[in-house]
Every structure is written in C-alpha cells, then in structure tokens.
C-alpha cells in the first residue's frame, strides 16, 4: 500500500471513530436525561405492583383411637380452580365449555347448585328443589333476591335473567343452562382477582392429567392439591364420629327475626366453598380439627405481568382428637353383638319376630370414658354418600345411633335403682322382706303377677334382685312412690343426659305429672315398665354408678387433644363427678350381692364364668303383640365386672330379643374381649386377622378361578374367628319359662298399660 492509500484509510478510520463518538455521546446524554429528569417516574412505574392474597386450606386434624391408630384422617385430593389473575383476555365462556368437555370425557362433574334442570322439549325450565328441604327453599329465596326477582318468579324467569346477565344468548339451550349454573356458582363464591373459583372437586388423576395436557389453552386453570376427609377405619363408631360437608346456604347467610343478615362463618374465616364438621364429633370439635389456613401471595405489576408468587403464611394443620375407644376392642364388641343377635334368631326366635337390631355401650367404671359404643346394624363411613339412598330406606335403620339415641323401656334392669332408693331412704334394710305368692293383691281391681321363678315366700332385697321378684318391687315401689325412686334413678344416670360430647336422647321416667298417672302406675314403673324409657348409654352409665357405690362420672368419648406435629397433649379430659349418692350403711353392697347372684340363674356361659359379674336382666314388653295379650319383648341387660373390683360397665338392648337372660353370653364375650385388650392378645389377634385378610386379597387377585376365590374367602374368614368370642349358640341350654327374669305381669282392664302413646318402645330419637 502506497502512502496516499494509507492516508485515505487513516482519514476513514478517524471519521468512523468520530461518528461512533457522536453516537455514544447521544446515548449518554439520553441516559442522563432519563435518569436525572424522569428517574422518579420510572422508579415509581417499576415499583407499582399489586399483591393478591389467596387462601391455602390447612389440613384437617386426625381422629385417632386411644392407642393412636388413625380412624379419620386427611388425604390429598385435586380440585379444578380458576384463577382470574392468570386468565388474561381469553374468552371466559369458551374456556368454560372446554373445561366442561374435558371433565365430561373423564366422567367428572362440576359444582352446580342452581336448582333448575335442563329445558324440556318446549324450552321451558323447572325448579329441582326439594319442597321439604329448608336449605333448598332458602337457597331459592336468596337466589331470587340476589337477581332482583320477586319470590314468585318462575324457573323461566330466573334463567332469562341469568342468560341476559352473563351474555349467553348465542349459546344453545343446553349450554345456556350449563354456563348459567357455572356463572351462578362463580357469583356464590365471589369469583374475582382476589377470590379463586373452585369449579370441580375431588377429580380423578386421569382428569388431572387431561387438563394439564391442555394447560396452554387454559390459562388460569389450575389443578390445586387440597385435603379430603377419609376414614382409615370406616366401621368404627361412624354415627358418633359424624361427617364433614360443604357449608349450606342457611349456615352461610343467617337472617334473624328482625331481618338482620349476618355471615357468622365468614367472620370466623371460612370461605363459602369450605368443608366443615356437620355432625357428631367432627362438628363438636370443629375448632380443634380445622387448623389455620395459610396465605399464598401473587404479585402483579402495572402491566399485568406476574412478577412473584410465594407462600407468605404457612398453613397449620388442625389438632388431633384422641378418643377413649380402642378400635380393636370396638370392633370386637361390634362382632359379638352381631353374633349374639344371630344366636338369638337361630336358637330362640325361630318362628317368631326376628331380633334385627341392638346396641351395646361399654364404659370404664373409673372415669366414665366410653370404651365401645356399638350399633347393629351400622354402616360404612366411606360409603355414606354413595349408599345413602340404600341406608336411609333400610327398615332396620343402619344410620340410627341406637346406642345414644335409642329409647327403650328398661324392664327389670330398673329394679336395682328402686332397691338403692329403698335402702338409702331407710324404707327397708337387709332383713326386710316381702311375701311373694305370685300375685300382688294390694289394689282392689289390679292384681299384677310374678312367676315366682326360683323363689317364693318371704323375700329380702338380695333375693329379690337375684330372682327378679316382681312382688317385692311392686310393694317397695308403691310404698316409696315414683317421686322418691325417680330422684335416685336420676342421680344414678337414668332419664337424663350422661354428658357425652355428641347428641343423645334424654328419655324420661314415669312421674305423677304423666297424663295417665294413677297409684298403680308407681307399681308398674318400679319394675321398669310404665312410661319410662332410657338409652343404652344411660344403662351403661347407671351400671357404672352402681359399681362406683353411687358416684356418677360424666360419660365421654374424647380422651385428649394433641398437637398434630409434636404429639404434645394440649388438653386432657379429666374424670368429672356429675352426681353422688352418699349411700348410708351397706346400700350398694347389698345391691351388689343381689346382682352378683343373677348369673347363677342364667343358663349359658355367664353362670360359670371365672370372673364374678354383677348384672341385672330386663325383659320389657313392646307394644306389638303376636297373640292376644302376648307382647313381643326386648332383651335388656346392665352389668359390671369384676363385681368386687369393677373395671367396666355394660348396657345392652336387643330389639325383639326376648328374655334379657339371652344376652348373658354377650356379656361374657365382651368381658373376654376386654381382658384380651388388657393383656395385649386382642391387638395381636387383630394384627393377625389383618395380615390374613391382606394375604387372602392378594391370593384372590392372583387367581382367575371364581371357585378358588370363593373358597379362599371362606377359609380366610374362618381362620380369623376369635375362639373366645364365638357364642355357644348351638349348644345353649333350653330356655326356661323365666330364665332368670320374671315374666311381665298379666294385664287386666284396670292395669295401666305398659306401652302408651307417651311410652313408645319404638326407637325413634327424641327431638
């Protein structure tokens, strides 16, 4: 390159550098201008963000048995949730149609509580509410009020308003109804930038996968993990545990007598779509089980861009509620109750009304805690929703909590209460006698009877309890009057609340204020007939009070409240004395002596059981007759054992069970299960049965031969039978005319009826 060429290149380089410097200078000047002149404006814009807080539902606390085994727990489920912040400008109704189609394809439904069905062929709509449902009627009224419609508005009026309000005119009638229902739900849940909309709940994993596959087409549609209630041991006291459910319209919006509207659950932090306890222990301990919800915060800038998502408050799970019940013992009592009813039907009720239902309650004598509360028949908690129609239409009433709400005439189980009253009041002592010749002749036109089974002549209180002498208690009851023996019966736990945490029937005793009262009614009520009705849990409480020499503890199901994370005991149920009969002299010892001798009068296992049992049978009449003057009978029993150092008390009722003595083997089976619980063998047996069941299920899963599967099931069940709990049904001794229980007195025209309108022996709960 010559010199001229070099000079040309140099000049060009200088020019290029100069241009670059000018451009750089212009950029620097612009940056200085932006930073110094408009810096505050840009800073404000950069920091102009908005936080949106969303609730993260806390897991519900577990319910466990006395050994810590889970009964009710929380499992993961999946909800389809719409987040308005993330939806952008996508057409909402088009997106809703797509979600509905995806849900339908996977057999799923979506939330729709609009009480209007699809249009008929003429294009008309009709309400689908239940005329008898208060909740439905309130929801309809609230819906019409919210839409600005009169209460006489028709379903067509409501749909017309919803279609117009939500711009659904261009959709087919079918889609108008679907989308109107979803929009209605959105309004109910207050769908907004700060409130997500739960469109579908508890969807399958297949539906989850399908929706996630279409996530790019569905902005703002999220799959949210949430908690669902499930029951690991769904057969354990389902009627006592109760249920959880969605918040109803009448609980969410409360209108008082002055027309003032309040939202008490919202004030407590609930959202309308939340689940809460609606019955039983799930409801009573809602505050403990519920937990504290967390908060998720989404931050969006002024351009609508999500710049941050974080969990600002971690949800805290609810506390654990620990029961006094051991699930293995409860299951054992359930089984022996069913076995006893089966035995009664096979051995005794072969040609008469079958025993179809019953209840047993077992208490810890020392503190009133419930060890078992069995109902037969019962139901599976996990199948409640799916089988509700079947359960509710079953004439044997499996949903009915007989143990706590069944009311039964106690029959002769009431006699120890009369004995306590007579002894403690000084009316009689251990040497006092009443002459029994089989007929009570005090009244001119009323002569109730006694079978004199095992006794006659002069009878003292111990012998009267042993042989259930009606004449003795007729006379003592007449002399005491119902005013006196009722006062003692109340203190012993009959005809009043036991104190359990959940709903129970109160029952009643026969009183002088009864509309059918006459002096002879005191005589009938003294043997547990008349108008008196009590529940099985009252019978068990009564037996425990007799065992405790007159001290009655509050009956309870809950042992403690525990911290879910640490297991720390937050609160514990202490023994609470509800009432005391001081018991002058040897009142309770004499009653105990009589009750200890009752087993010797009963055929079957109880008469030779090595552990002394104090018990009293009852054979109350039912209103139904199987022949003129012949009433069907219930079988009743109260017991405690060991008689000289009581640990457990038992109350039993078997509908149409016949004589109370037929429950003697049931008492023994319960005792065997209790002692097996104490020595650990019951837990070992339960574990062995569980393993055998699992093995059987695995074997059945591997076999393709139905005959082999059936044979395997039979073998497995037979192997799992606990030997000590199999009633000696087929070898039971022939039933005697009285079998340890005096037959009901023969009625004549002047005798007050044992069953009246005020004294139903039906099992309906008291309101």
Predicted regions and their residues:
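Beta-lactam-recognizing serine transpeptidase/beta-lactamase-like catalytic domain environment
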Residues: 70-72, 78, 299-316, 325, ...
């Amino acid at each position: 390159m010559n010199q001229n060429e070099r000079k040309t290149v140099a000049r060009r380089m200088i020019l290029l550098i100069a241009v670059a410097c000018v451009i750089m200078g212009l950029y620097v000047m612009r940056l200085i201008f932006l930073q110094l002149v408009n810096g505050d404006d840009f800073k404000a814009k950069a920091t102009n963000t908005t936080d949106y807080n969303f609730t993260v539902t806390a897991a519900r606390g577990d319910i466990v048995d006395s050994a810590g085994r889970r009964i009710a727990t929380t499992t993961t489920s999946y909800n389809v949730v719409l987040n308005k912040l993330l939806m952008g400008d996508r057409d909402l109704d088009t997106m809703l149609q797509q979600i509905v189609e995806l849900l339908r394809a996977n057999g799923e439904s979506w939330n729709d509580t609009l009480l209007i069905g699809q249009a008929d062929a003429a294009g008309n709509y009709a309400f689908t509410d239940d005329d008898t449902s208060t909740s439905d009627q309130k929801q309809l009224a609230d819906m019409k009020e919210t839409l600005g419609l009169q209460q006489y508005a028709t379903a067509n009026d409501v749909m017309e308003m919803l279609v117009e309000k939500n711009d659904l005119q261009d959709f087919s009638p079918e889609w108008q109804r679907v989308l109107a229902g979803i929009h209605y739900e959105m309004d109910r849940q207050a769908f907004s930038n700060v409130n997500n909309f739960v469109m579908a709940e508890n969807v399958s994993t297949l539906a989850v996968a399908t929706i996630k596959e279409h996530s790019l087409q569905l902005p703002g549609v999220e799959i949210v993990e949430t908690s669902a209630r499930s029951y690991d041991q769904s057969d354990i006291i389902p009627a006592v545990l109760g249920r959880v459910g969605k918040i109803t319209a009448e609980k969410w919006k409360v209108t008082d007598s002055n027309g003032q509207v309040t939202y008490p659950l919202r004030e407590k932090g609930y959202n309308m779509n939340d689940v809460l306890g609606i019955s039983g222990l799930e409801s009573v301990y809602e505050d403990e089980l519920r937990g504290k919800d967390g908060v998720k915060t989404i931050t969006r800038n002024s351009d609508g861009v999500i710049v941050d998502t974080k969990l600002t408050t971690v949800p805290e799970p609810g506390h654990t509620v620990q029961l006094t019940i051991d699930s293995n013992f409860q299951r054992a009592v359930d089984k022996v109750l069913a076995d006893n009813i089966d035995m009664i039907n096979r051995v005794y009720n072969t040609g008469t009304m079958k025993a179809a239902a019953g209840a047993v309650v077992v208490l810890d004598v020392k503190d009133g805690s419930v060890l078992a509360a069995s109902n037969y028949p019962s139901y599976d908690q996990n199948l409640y929703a799916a089988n509700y129609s079947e359960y509710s239409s079953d004439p044997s009433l499996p949903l009915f909590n007989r143990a706590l709400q069944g009311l039964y005439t106690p029959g002769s189980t009431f006699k120890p209460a009369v004995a306590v009253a007579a002894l403690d009041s000084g009316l009689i002592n251990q040497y006092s006698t009443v002459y029994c010749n089989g007929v009570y002749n005090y009244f001119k036109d009323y002569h109730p009877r006694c079978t004199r089974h095992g006794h006659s002549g002069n009878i003292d209180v111990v012998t009267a309890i042993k042989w259930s002498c009606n004449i003795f208690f007729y006379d003592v009851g007449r002399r005491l009057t119902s005013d006196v023996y009722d006062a003692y019966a109340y203190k012993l736990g009959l005809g009043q609340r036991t104190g359990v945490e959940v709903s129970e029937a109160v029952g009643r005793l026969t009183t002088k204020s009864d509309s059918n009262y006459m002096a002879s009614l005191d005589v009938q009520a003294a043997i547990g007939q008349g108008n008196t009705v009590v529940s099985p849990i009252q019978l068990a409480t009564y037996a425990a009070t007799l065992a405790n020499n007159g001290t009655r503890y509050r009956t309870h199901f809950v042992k403690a409240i525990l911290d879910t994370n640490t297991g720390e005991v937050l609160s514990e149920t202490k023994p609470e004395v509800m009432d005391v009969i001081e018991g002058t002299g040897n009142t309770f010892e004499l009653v105990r002596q009589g009750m200890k001798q009752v087993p010797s009068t009963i055929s079957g296992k109880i008469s030779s059981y090595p552990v002394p049992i104090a018990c009293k049978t009852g054979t109350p009449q039912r209103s139904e007759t199987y022949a003129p003057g012949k009433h069907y009978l219930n079988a009743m029993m109260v017991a405690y054992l060991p008689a000289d150092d009581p640990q457990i008390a038992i109350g039993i009722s078997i509908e149409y069970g016949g004589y109370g003595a037929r429950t003697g083997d049931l008492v023994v089976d319960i005792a065997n299960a209790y002692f097996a619980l104490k020595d650990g063998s019951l837990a070992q047996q339960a574990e062995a049965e569980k393993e055998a069941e699992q093995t059987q299920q695995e074997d059945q899963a591997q076999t393709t031969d139905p005959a082999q599967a059936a044979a395997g099931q039979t073998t497995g069940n037979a192997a799992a039978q606990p030997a000590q709990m199999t009633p000696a049904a087929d070898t039971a001794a022939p039933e005697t005319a009285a079998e340890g229980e005096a037959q009901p007195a023969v009625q004549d025209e002047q005798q007050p009826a044992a069953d009246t309108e005020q004294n139903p022996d039906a099992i309906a709960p008291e309101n």
